[in-house]
Amino acid sequence: MSDHAVNTPVHAARAHGHRAPRAEFYVYFAVILLGGFPVAFVSWIVSTIRHRRLPKRGPFASAWFDAKAITPLIFRA
């Protein structure tokens, strides 16, 4: 008989999925955030003028969301 409790999905997820972010991750995140903020600000202004109301997310929240989505893609490659 084999022991199926050795490599349970819980242990596999802990071993591969959750690593502590390193300084390099935070540097890339900051660079992407600072580079994305002017673009998000301009698009926020254009959207405000076109629709004559404020968007749901502000420019900083939009840049934060983009940096949060893009940075992990760099480290997965």
UniProtKB/Swiss-Prot annotation:
Read off the Pfam families from this record: PufQ
Its protein name is: Protein PufQ
* Keyword annotations from UniProtKB, A to Z: Bacteriochlorophyll biosynthesis, Chlorophyll biosynthesis, Photosynthesis
Gene name of this polypeptide: pufQ
One of its GO biological process terms is:
bacteriochlorophyll biosynthetic process
Function in brief: Required for bacteriochlorophyll biosynthesis. Directly involved in the assembly of both the B875 and B800-850 pigment-protein complexes.
Recall the taxonomic lineage recorded for the source organism: Bacteria, Pseudomonadati, Pseudomonadota, Alphaproteobacteria, Rhodobacterales
The text of the family note is:
Belongs to the PufQ family.
Q: Which InterPro entries match?
A: PufQ_cyt-su (IPR008800)
What organism is this sequence from? Answer: Cereibacter sphaeroides (Rhodobacter sphaeroides)
